[in-house]
Amino acid sequence: MPPLKYDYAYRLKRDFPDFEIIINGGIKTEAEIDEHLRHLDGVMLGREAYHNPFVMATFDQRYYGDDSASKSREQILEVMIPYIQAQLAQHGAKGLKLNSITRHMLGLMTGLPGARAFRQVLSDSKKLAAGDANLLLEAAARLRTAA
């Protein structure tokens, strides 16, 4: 991948101030977002949002003034269990590959003690094949025992 040249985007915005310029690539922290927003109209998080989705937990409040409380990681797991159960009921364990849901949750606990064990449970092919939504409870228990 070629090196990212943010200054090129900044120069474009200076040269064409009426154009909406939004940047994407290599952005991982709120400090980096804030720096880019000093120069540009928007920022997109790509890989970081996927690998560490909880990084966005405060974005609505911080960037849009939405004071409604964001969900905790535990609350997210709590709502995912009935969602998975509903998907299993609709498609059956054979028709739904559980990892089509859980793979998008692998980074949810990034940075917490036990995050690796959490990912291991959600990636275990035998457990996934069983098609049991309680897999999330087992993964969460690994976090608690690591803390």
For each feature predicted by the language model, list its residue ranges.
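Alpha/beta catalytic cores of nucleotide-metabolism and tRNA/nucleoside-modifying enzymes
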Residues: 3-23, 27-147
